[in-house]
Amino acid sequence: AWFRSKGYGPVKPPILERAAPFLDRLGEEIRSRMYIFTDPGGHEVCLRPEMTIPTARLYADSIHERGGPFRCYYVGSVFRFDWPREGRYRQFTQAGAEFFGGADAADADVEVLALAHGLLQSYGLSDLHVQVGDVAFFAALLADERLAPAWRMRLARAAPDFATLERELAQDAERRATTPASPEGDSEIGALLDQTPAAQRDALLADVLTTVGPEHFGVRTPEQIARRLLNRAEARGPIEPAIATALTSLLAVDLPLDEGLAEVRGIADAAGSAALAALADGWDRRVALLAERGVDPAGVRLRPRMGRGIHYYTGFVFEIHDGTDSAESQLCGGGRYDDLVESVGGTEPVPAVGFSLGLERVQLRLAEEAP
């Protein structure tokens, strides 16, 4: 009744799904707990471990062609291996909602967060703590042209798991602190490359290689050899210091929303990242919309490192926790996934945002709060 009253209609994604989309787009924490087997036709299939991917595939297969925004909700069983304990089950009921095709991303993000917040309040839960983040903050820094391509690829692979990204940055800081600088004049070409923006180094080295003569290249072009040599050199070298510092600082932000956004702007200014500054400025509208939709921004914390362990998120993410300090305090979570529909069979990217919650965990909290 709650979802219908907000304009969301029911969908029923299948329980049995192809395993590949889940293996490709979920984080290791969920992938390692999936129930996967091979059907008689030789296809790898699974019991759905969550509902967003099946709903996105359903939308791509049969609803997208209708055009326009589409709001839907679901309630159904999902399956993840676990050692049964309080708040953790191998089969549990997941309820949630997805909003596909909303042209105004900020408005759609806040609509879905407010929908989740209101749903939990409708159950009788009042001590709710909202945390938000934005995966795009990190993507903006990784796209910076000062970052060497080899490091861009390496950090992009690590970024969905922020603990892994943190380790990469810590190891880089240790290398920079313990590795002496190369003696001046050690390599004229190396010095020249150091003074050249990362985006222009391929062309510079390829020009140098063309003076050697094609008989030394075999079947590869000077450009291919240049890229390979640069990848090796960049992988051994440090991360661009301004970007490394900005990434490390972002991972440390855990502040009330207004203070957190001010901190992100400061990080952007220090790093000289116009892209990150623009993203932080774009959050001002979300803050205003939160207040309009009944979620007090003063009670929201900004935690950019909150990727939720799921790899399909592309921007805004959020979690709502109860007031306990337990490991199972999270009641629901969600976020934006603008490229998921295309990756599961859609003909083009579709802006989308949604959330889900485990009903058993909510019922457990309600029982604990009952007089």
Description of each model-found segment:
Residues 2-6, 17-20, 52-65, 69-126, ...:
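Positively charged, Gly/Ser-enriched RNA/tRNA-binding surfaces
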Residues 11, 15-45, 88:
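Polyanion/phosphate-binding surface patch
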Residues 13-15, 129-136:
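Acidic carboxylate-rich catalytic motifs and surrounding loops in phosphoryl-/glycosyl-chemistry enzymes
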Residues 19-20, 136-137, 158:
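Short secondary-structure capping/turn micro-motifs that flank functional sites
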Residues 25-29, 144-146, 316-318:
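Short low-complexity, flexible loop/linker segments enriched in glycine and/or proline
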Residues 33-41, 146-181, 322-324:
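Acidic, His- and aromatic-enriched active-site or binding-groove loops in soluble protein domains
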Residues 91-96, 132-140:
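Short, conserved phosphate-binding/catalytic loop or strand-edge motifs used
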